[in-house]
Amino acid sequence: MPPASATKVLAIHRVPPPPPTGTTNDQAAGVGTTIVTSFRVFPALPFRARWIARITEFEWNHFFADVQEKGPFKDWHHRHDFLAQTRDGVTGTLVHDVIDYEVGFGFAGVIANSLLVRRQMEGTFAERQQRLAQLLAQQY
């Protein structure tokens, strides 16, 4: 990943997945900010789900955390950490996501998480990391 300040990474990190997978309302930053996202649960199908999250913690250039207020999960807590890191003598920013979630729906949710949800989320976050690297590379 190209070297970048936490400020630049934080600004770009708020970019949602590209349509048609997901869209996000314009976002301000700070505690209490509500983020509304529309996304396809199954990308091959036209059905969209709405996800409402609220930022509960925020420290500029260091981290922010959000919780789901309404959406596909029984429980969702997500923390985005922006950590200064030096590699090969170049200082940049490492983005680290910590996610604690519960699918719900009892045993069926456990099965769905094992077969689909976890892999889909891993793919979404891997795509976000790739997009972040691409967008930052365009800045340099």
Which residue ranges define each predicted feature?
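A structure-centric signal for secondary-structure junctions around beta-strands
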Residues: 6, 52, 90-92
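Amphipathic alpha-helical segments
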Residues: 1-5
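Beta-strand/loop substructures that line and gate deep hydrophobic ligand-binding cavities in soluble
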Residues: 65-123
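Glycine-rich portal/gate segments that line the openings of hydrophobic small-molecule binding cavities
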Residues: 8-69, 135-140
